[in-house]
């Protein structure tokens, strides 16, 4: 499972012209689910993402996680994160989990974020989404379990 996390001042996701998820300060989490991923990996990745210290403290040092910084999260499924890009001119997606399993684990990950007490907004699995964000930094990290 892969999470591309971006520290944002704001972010939103729109489907069919309607905003379905929106946050101010926090993390935009683009989530890719691979074959072999399970609840244990999703739980571990959620713990890492929510605990990752990428927000500035009073001295400006990256020392606070999203909860400590009073931020929110917007979780958006993105199967292209699991693409095989090693060869050729076209990405391959054979490493991606079957859509039904990917959706289940995406929903599980979202549930884990909410159980941790972080306000969590979402995109819509398998939809054509328009994601808007204002990067803060920019600060972007790739986390993988």
From Swiss-Prot:
Keywords: Cytoplasm, Hydrolase, RNA-binding, tRNA-binding. InterPro entries: Daa-tRNA_deacyls_DTD, DTD-like_sf. It comes from the Bacteria. Belongs to the DTD family. A Gly-cisPro motif from one monomer fits into the active site of the other monomer to allow specific chiral rejection of L-amino acids. An aminoacyl-tRNA editing enzyme that deacylates mischarged D-aminoacyl-tRNAs. Also deacylates mischarged glycyl-tRNA(Ala), protecting cells against glycine mischarging by AlaRS. Acts via tRNA-based rather than protein-based catalysis; rejects L-amino acids rather than detecting D-amino acids in the active site. By recycling D-aminoacyl-tRNA to D-amino acids and free tRNA molecules, this enzyme counteracts the toxicity associated with the formation of D-aminoacyl-tRNA entities in vivo and helps enforce protein L-homochirality. This is D-aminoacyl-tRNA deacylase. It comes from Pectobacterium carotovorum subsp. carotovorum (strain PC1). The lineage of its organism: Bacteria, Pseudomonadati, Pseudomonadota, Gammaproteobacteria, Enterobacterales. The gene is dtd.
